[in-house]
Amino acid sequence: MPAPRYKSGSSKKVYRKAPGNSSIVHYRRKKQSKAVCGACGALLNGVPRGRAVEITKLAKTEKRPERAFGGNLCPKCVKKMMVAKARNF
């Protein structure tokens, strides 16, 4: 029976062979899903893939791109939005 901390859905089972040809189970943390654009759903470049604990240890400039809506929208959607706002202004 696994320990309660391993029964979570955030743990991933990894089967390993031990000496003597016995199979044992190791538990690993699952990787976080990649960041996606809020408007079109495209994958965002320059945004790290990791748990919140790992990302807080990074420098500010490593967490997301240094531009308008960096880390939330892809460059194409930002450009479309700015052009639309400029035309309606």
UniProtKB/Swiss-Prot annotation:
Residues 1-22 are annotated as: Disordered. It comes from the Archaea. GO terms for cellular component: ribonucleoprotein complex; ribosome. GO terms for molecular function: structural constituent of ribosome. GO terms for biological process: translation. Belongs to the eukaryotic ribosomal protein eL34 family. PANTHER family: 60S RIBOSOMAL PROTEIN L34. This is Large ribosomal subunit protein eL34. It comes from Methanococcus maripaludis (strain C5 / ATCC BAA-1333).
